[in-house]
């Protein structure tokens, strides 16, 4: 990395394992400056509970970024709304979580940070606080005024993007339109090139129906919608294979020659990836005007403050963000 960059981290739900994981991140050196948008006492109390050293450094945006030393974090202070007990949700802190996300997102939009890495949030408690919240992806899409974003999960061996995300299964078929597929595949192809450094990415596209429709005998969405879109995009120079049956696509015969898979819906592609690499996966939001990665797990309230949380996914998310920064420079 030619110049040291700043990345911003949001720990997520304060009563969950997010603060534990951020404190664990601080136990090693990093080639970027780690700016954590959080309450200072939350971090120091959690570090004390875990028996880990932590010094919080003041955030100085007007000074050059420095690599993060082990045992330290740079603090961008955001005040809690109520005291925190690990493992116990507080509706009062639902707004605090959103405050951290908003500040981090705005900093990325203004060029203050090169990437954003998010810890796990509890959607229920945010909504109970009176803040409509579907998830990180939708929040950043709206706040950045992005035209469209795409959710992708990745491990070292596999990348799976989704044409639709958090929809009831009965609504998926109606959502798979030519316009949607053109947009999603365009974003996926663009970001694989610009953020992942792949000059000519090869994308495998799942069918919607069992056996990819079996020639129209198990549904016609492949014939009516997916195939025409893929033909059009291939004519524009994209390397696309499909539509392929999802039950046979996830094998070396196909994956060894591909850079990403596009699944039509959430539970078509993600169970395979999470079985293959749970705890090592990263959630990436494509289509944003900045780099955003996240852990692939939840708040694990029962583990908060106990020293049992696995920091692996957070480390992977941060390392991937650093690689993406390099690819975009």
Curated annotation (Swiss-Prot):
Task: Give me the comment on cofactor binding.
Answer: Binds 1 divalent metal cation per subunit. Can use ions such as Zn(2+), Mg(2+) or Co(2+).
SUPFAM superfamilies, per the entry: Isocitrate/Isopropylmalate dehydrogenase-like (SSF53659)
Span of the secretion signal? none
Q: Where in the cell is it found?
A: Cytoplasm
**Which residues bind a divalent metal cation per the record?**
166, 211, 266
> Which reaction(s) does the protein catalyse, per the Swiss-Prot or TrEMBL entry?
4-(phosphooxy)-L-threonine + NAD(+) = 3-amino-2-oxopropyl phosphate + CO2 + NADH
What keywords are annotated for this sequence in UniProt? Cobalt, Cytoplasm, Magnesium, Metal-binding, NAD, NADP, Oxidoreductase, Pyridoxine biosynthesis, Zinc
The cofactor required is: Zn(2+); Mg(2+); Co(2+)
Query: Which EC number(s) are documented for this chain?
Result: 1.1.1.262
**Which GO molecular function annotation, any one, does this entry have?**
zinc ion binding
Record's subunit section: Homodimer.
Q: State the family named in the UniProt similarity comment for this chain.
A: Belongs to the PdxA family.
Tell me the PANTHER family matching this sequence: 4-HYDROXYTHREONINE-4-PHOSPHATE DEHYDROGENASE (PTHR30004:SF5)
- Other observations noted: The active site is located at the dimer interface.
The UniProt entry, under HAMAP family, shows: PdxA
The molecule here is called 4-hydroxythreonine-4-phosphate dehydrogenase
**Organism whose genome encodes this protein:** Citrobacter koseri (strain ATCC BAA-895 / CDC 4225-83 / SGSC4696)
